[in-house]
Amino acid sequence: MFKFKQVIVVRKDLKLSKGKLAVQVAHGAVTAAFKAYKEKREWFEKWFHEGQKKVVVKVESLDELFKLKAEAEKLNLPTALIQDAGLTEIPPGTITVLAIGPGPSEIIDKVTGHLKLL
């Protein structure tokens, strides 16, 4: 069983293409992992050596994303909000995903455990 994980939360209201969605999720995963590497090195290393578990879940709105970010930050979890450059499908600066962690699974579950998988 994994003791550490990373969760990437996707906005479904944007109706992104599969390719665009995959890229946004990747941006979130890398950005949050880099932040954890700098700020929560022990969590990052344990997550990395366990196999780098990632889970992708969905929300229906930007407001939900902001609420989750605030909850995660209260628990001192690394987070990353991703804004699109706006070169293809959506306007510049559109927030597409929130990545949380890597961090202890039981802490991240307090924030995202109720969300449905993408």
UniProtKB/Swiss-Prot annotation:
<comment type="function">
    <text>The natural substrate for this enzyme may be peptidyl-tRNAs which drop off the ribosome during protein synthesis.</text>
</comment>
<dbReference type="InterPro" id="IPR023476">
    <property type="entry name" value="Pep_tRNA_hydro_II_dom_sf"/>
</dbReference>
<dbReference type="GO" id="GO:0004045">
    <property type="term" value="F:peptidyl-tRNA hydrolase activity"/>
</dbReference>
<protein>
    <recommendedName>
        <fullName>Peptidyl-tRNA hydrolase</fullName>
        <ecNumber>3.1.1.29</ecNumber>
    </recommendedName>
</protein>
<dbReference type="InterPro" id="IPR034759">
    <property type="entry name" value="Pept_tRNA_hydro_arch"/>
</dbReference>
<dbReference type="GO" id="GO:0006412">
    <property type="term" value="P:translation"/>
</dbReference>
<keyword id="KW-0963">Cytoplasm</keyword>
<keyword id="KW-0378">Hydrolase</keyword>
<comment type="similarity">
    <text>Belongs to the PTH2 family.</text>
</comment>
<dbReference type="InterPro" id="IPR002833">
    <property type="entry name" value="PTH2"/>
</dbReference>
<dbReference type="GO" id="GO:0005829">
    <property type="term" value="C:cytosol"/>
</dbReference>
<dbReference type="Pfam" id="PF01981">
    <property type="entry name" value="PTH2"/>
</dbReference>
